[in-house]
Amino acid sequence: FYSKYGIESNGRIRYFNFQRNEELEEQVYKDIIGDDDREYVLYHDAHPGESNMEFDRHSDYRYIDLNGIVKNPFSLIKVLINAKEIHVVDSFWASVCFNIDAKYGLFNDVPIYLYPFKHHNRWGGILKDSTYIDEMNLPVKLTNWEVVCQTKI
C-alpha cells in the first residue's frame, strides 16, 4: 500500500520511527502472557480462506491470535520479541513487524512466517499475492523471515 501513496520501498523503513514505552510493554506482556511459562506462538490470519496459512501446532506451546489483541501495536513489542515463532498473513501485522524488524532488528531471534494472499491481485502489505512470490523486492533482506506459499496460482 506504500506504493499507492508514492512512498518508495526503502522510505518505508528509513522514515519509520517510534519511541518504545517499556513500562507499557511490560504491562501488556503481563496481561497477555501472565504467569503461563509455556513458550508461545503468535499468529494473525484475519482473513481465513484468503491465504494458505497452515502450521503445525504443538501441545507444548500456547497459541495467541494477534487479531484485535491490542489497540496500540507498539505496546506488544515485548510479547513479539519473546515469541517462539510468528505466523502472519500479509496484513497490517506483517507490515508492522517487518518495519520494526528491518529498522531495529528487534525480532532477529524470532522465526517469522509470512503467508501471501492466494487470490489473484489481492494486495497485502508486503507482497501482492502468491503469483508475485518471486518479486518480493524489499530493501532489506531479513534472514529470520520466510515466505510460505504452499501453492502458486
What feature does the model see in each segment?
Residues 1-153:
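Catalytic machinery of carbohydrate-active enzymes
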